[in-house]
């Protein structure tokens, strides 16, 4: 069983949870006509970044798929960011049952506003870690954690498993 065989009701529940009061317009992504052009506004989410569109629904697709596939471990999201992804992912996963999120960012590689957004994100299951280095260093660190078999085994034994909110997760495209 996969999420792609989800019922209309399951997908509807994911959509309703994702695109609720966190968006400031009932249309979520309104199509606006200006002159002879049309624009799809993707900035109405809680972080005002287009990434809110995918990262608001990803936690609900992920937890629905996990439940359908009998996954009982808590899912620990590890994500590297150079800015927008971190805050949008943290906002999407904040207080979603069965998940935790840890965002790694270059301490001197994001804007002061982005850093403050991440550091002040509410949620009992959210954490953010500033690293010395650049985005590539943060991403390499996350990849190294994913590839550490011993760590994965220990975490699995404690009831946890890793996933990501970066674009390597197919859920970002769904």
Residue ranges, per PLM feature:
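Catalytic cores of large soluble enzymes that bind and process phosphate-bearing ligands
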Residues: 7, 45-50, 54, 77, ...
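Short, small-residue-biased leader/transition segments that mark boundaries at the very start
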Residues: 2-3
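Conserved internal helical-beta-strand scaffold that buttresses enzyme catalytic cores
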Residues: 25, 46, 99-101, 133, ...
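Glycine/threonine-rich beta-strand-loop-alpha-helix active-site module
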Residues: 77-116, 121
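Small/polar-residue-rich loop-to-helix segments that shape phosphate-bearing ligand pockets
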Residues: 104-174
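Well-ordered mid-protein domain cores that form the structural environment of catalytic cofactors
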Residues: 38-92
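Anion-binding (especially nucleotide phosphate/pyrophosphate-binding) glycine-rich loop
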Residues: 6-43
């Amino acid at each position: 069983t996969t999420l792609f065989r989800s019922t209309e009701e399951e997908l509807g529940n994911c959509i309703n949870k994702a695109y609720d009061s966190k968006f400031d317009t009932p249309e979520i992504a309104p199509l606006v006509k200006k002159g002879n052009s049309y624009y799809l506004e993707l900035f109405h989410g809680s972080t005002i970044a287009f990434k809110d569109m995918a990262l608001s629904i990803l936690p609900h697709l992920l937890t629905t798929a996990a439940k359908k596939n009998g996954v009982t471990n808590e899912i620990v999201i590890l994500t590297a960011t150079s800015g927008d992804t971190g805050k949008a992912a943290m906002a999407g996963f904040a207080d979603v049952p069965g998940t935790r999120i840890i965002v790694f960012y270059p301490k001197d590689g994001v804007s002061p506003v982005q850093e403050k957004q991440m550091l002040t994100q509410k949620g009992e299951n959210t954490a953010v870690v500033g690293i010395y280095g650049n985005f590539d260093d943060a991403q390499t660190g996350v990849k190294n954690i994913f590839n550490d078999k011993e760590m994965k085994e220990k975490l699995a034994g404690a009831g946890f498993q890793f996933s990501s909110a970066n674009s390597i997760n197919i859920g970002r495209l769904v």
